[in-house]
Amino acid sequence: DQVEILEKAYVRASNFSGGQQQRVGIARALSQKPKVMLADEPVASLDPITSRVVMNYLKKINTELGITTIVNLHFLDLAKEFGDRLIGLRDGKLVFDGNVDGVSDEDFENIYGRSIKSSDLIGND
C-alpha cells in the first residue's frame, strides 16, 4: 500500500486513470523488492498535479524505503524539485553530473543545446 491504491486491487487496470496506472506500475515494481527502481518518463502524459503525486511516491520510495531511484525526466522543475543528483546527456555524451542544488540554467542550456523554454517546465505550454 506504498502508493495508496490497495482499494483498487480488484479493479481492471484498463479502467484506471494515467496516474493510477503509473502507481500500479510502481506497486508492481515494489512487489519484486528491488534494490534499484528505474522510471522512464513516469509523468510524461500526466497533468501537473498528478505528476507531482507520482514524483512524491518515487521520492518516498527512495527516502523511506532506501531504494535507489533513477528517473528519466524532461521537466526541469521536477528534476530540480525531486532529484538529488542530476545526470545530463546530450547526443549520447555526458555533459553534466552533479548535485541538483548546483545545476544552473546555463547547465540546462548545455544539456539541451538551446535556451530553456517555459515548455521545459511542467504545467507550461
Predicted feature locations:
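Conserved ABC ATPase "signature" region
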Residues: D1-E7
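Conserved ABC ATPase signature
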Residues: R12-F16, Q20
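Conserved catalytic motifs of ABC-family nucleotide-binding domains
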Residues: K33
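Catalytic Walker B motif of ABC-type/P-loop ATPase nucleotide-binding domains
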Residues: M37-D40
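H-loop/switch region of ABC-family ATPase nucleotide-binding domains
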Residues: L73-H74
